[in-house]
Amino acid sequence: MIRIIAIVVLFFLQCQADLPPVMKGLEENKVTGVWYGIAAASNCKQFLQMKSDNMPAPVNIYSLNNGHMKSSTSFQTEKGCQQMDVEMTTVEKGHYKWKMQQGDSETIIVATDYDAFLMEFTKIQMGAEVCVTVKLFGRKDTLPEDKIKHFEDHIEKVGLKKEQYIRFHTKATCVPK
C-alpha cells in the first residue's frame, strides 16, 4: 500500500514539475487590461495546422472577477471576429486552472514588466497527450527585439522548436467586448 501511495505522489510531483514557476512577486492587479499578441509557440496539433505567416494577432484582456482571473481573447477568422472567454480558478497568483472541451488546462504567467510585455505558459492535458503553448503579449502591438529574443530563448527551454513558433505580422483587428 505504501508503495502505491509513493508511486501516486511521484506521478503527481512529475506532473507539477512540467510547469514553469510563476514570476516571483507577481502583482496580479497590474496584469489586468489589454494585451496584444506578438508571438506564440505550441506543439498543439490545431495550432500547427492553423499556423501561417499572415496569421492575425489575437488580443487578450485579463480581468479579475471575485478573486479569479478572467481571460477574454479575440481573433480574426474567415467567419469574422471570434471571442473566447475563460473564467480561470486561481491556484496561486499567476497560476490558473480552467477546463476546455479538449481537456484540463493550466496557465502560468512566467514573466512581465506590466507596462510593455507579458509571457504566458499554458499546458492542456488531452488524455495521454500534453499540449504546450507559450505566448508573448505586448501592451502595444510591437515590442523591442530584445523582448522577442528573450521569448525565443524561453520557448527552447520548455521543449518547443523553432518550427512551432510564429511571430504575428498582421495587426490585430478584433478586440474583446
Swiss-Prot record:
Secreted keyword on record: yes
Disulfide bonds: C81-C174
Cleaved signal peptide residues: 1-17
CDD domains the UniProt entry points to: lipocalin_FABP
Compartment list: Secreted
Predominant localisation class: secreted
Alphabetical GO biological process terms: sensory perception of smell
Single GO molecular function: small molecule binding
DNA repair in keyword set: no
Cellular component annotations (GO), alphabetically ordered: extracellular region
Alphabetically ordered keywords of this record: Disulfide bond, Olfaction, Secreted, Sensory transduction, Signal
Origin: domain of life: Eukaryota
Tissue occurrence: Synthesized in Bowman glands, which secrete the mucus that bathes the cilia of the olfactory neuroepithelium.
Name of one Pfam family that matches: Lipocalin
Annotated family: Belongs to the calycin superfamily. Lipocalin family.
Name of this chain's protein: Olfactory protein
Species for this entry: Lithobates pipiens (Northern leopard frog)
Source taxonomy: Eukaryota, Metazoa, Chordata, Craniata, Vertebrata
